[in-house]
């Protein structure tokens, strides 16, 4: 057996051959051999061939790798792996360096482009610059040399420049609205925002589009680019749920307070509504409140507070129809009802059992309020939990802080509304049981 040498691999020494202690014939017969060589005494007596075979050592096989060779092989493998890792890191660093150089190059190109655009726009207003300089003060002349440099915005803001210098047409976006200090002194009360003869704006109307169409343009104004369509630039549609909720709450107060004396109340007072009018008005109000709750703008804390107050007022009117006394005996009820035409939906509720029939009528209507209170309570609970994501308001600004009302106020409204409904239902049931 010869030893083989490879490049970089040490030579493997072949161990000497060791013969077995007994011959092959004695080993097969399991007899003790005299170990005489070349022929033992037993093989001589029997006349058989005596053959000594090589001894087979237990453990590693002949020609296996030695410990030093294995350690050398493992060392070479680890070195190759480390070289590959270093190559990967080097390639990653090269790619990152190229990306950073490309980003810096793009940044420089963008800066150069902005600088060129600024220098191109600066001399495009030769006529307006002297007028601006002349309006800054008496010491400045329009014929003074013009020095180009960074603009002084503080000076522009401090100087009394008239807006007419900018050649912008005077557009009246909201006709009849004068924002001077004199008008702010006599600012009207909130109920005057919604005149009784003016219809309530619907969701499909667009105030901005109408104002652009109706705004007058002076004849001597320079040519301006056409105003883009509001709906084409992605402006959110205007929603009128909040003024609609205010109108609903205002219409639930047809009778003026006895302690309130104003010129409008002295001129004439409206007659109290009938039972039929109260029932019809409450049904319509509940439908309107349901539509407002289903709208996305009901996430606003102010809107949901107003419709909750309207729901309280609906319960108060139902309590008045059912002849339920107010909470405080000293307070005067604002819900006055004309009970003379006591006919509701073809039923005559006049007579001795008028109170019982009115209570049954209100009890049959409370399922609408119960369904509304469930939806409203869920909406109020969502407001209190604050688990809704930030949304875009009608102005297009991220309205993540639109929960401006205290959480405990909304939570208290939800609890009180449910308690008021349960109290009214239990009082009506007790009255019907007493007969």
From Swiss-Prot:
Q: What does this protein do?
A: Transcription factor that regulates the expression of the gene cluster that mediates the biosynthesis of monodictyphenone, a prenyl xanthone derivative.
Q: Which gene encodes it?
A: mdpE
Name of the protein described by the UniProt record: Monodictyphenone cluster transcription factor
The compartments listed are: Nucleus
Q: Per the annotation, which location comes first and is thus the protein's main one?
A: nucleus
Q: Name the CDD domains for this protein.
A: GAL4
Query: In the UniProt record for this chain, what is stated about the effect of gene disruption?
Result: Impairs the production of monodictyphenone and of any of the intermediates of the pathway.
Organism, by scientific name, is Emericella nidulans (strain FGSC A4 / ATCC 38163 / CBS 112.46 / NRRL 194 / M139) (Aspergillus nidulans)
> Cross-referenced PANTHER family, in alphabetical order?
MONODICTYPHENONE CLUSTER TRANSCRIPTION FACTOR-RELATED, OLEATE-ACTIVATED TRANSCRIPTION FACTOR 1-RELATED
A Pfam match:
Zn_clus
Coiled-coil intervals in this record? none
The cellular component terms of Gene Ontology attached to this UniProt record, alphabetical and capped at eight, are: nucleus
Decide whether keyword Chaperone is in the record: no
Sorted UniProt keywords: DNA-binding, Metal-binding, Nucleus, Transcription, Transcription regulation, Zinc
Composition-biased stretches, type Low complexity, lie in: 130-147
Q: Biological process GO terms, please?
A: aflatoxin biosynthetic process; monodictyphenone biosynthetic process; regulation of secondary metabolic process
DNA-binding region, residues: 23-50
Using the UniProt annotation, give all residue ranges assigned to the region (Disordered): 117-147
**What GO molecular function terms would the record report?**
DNA binding; DNA-binding transcription factor activity, RNA polymerase II-specific; zinc ion binding
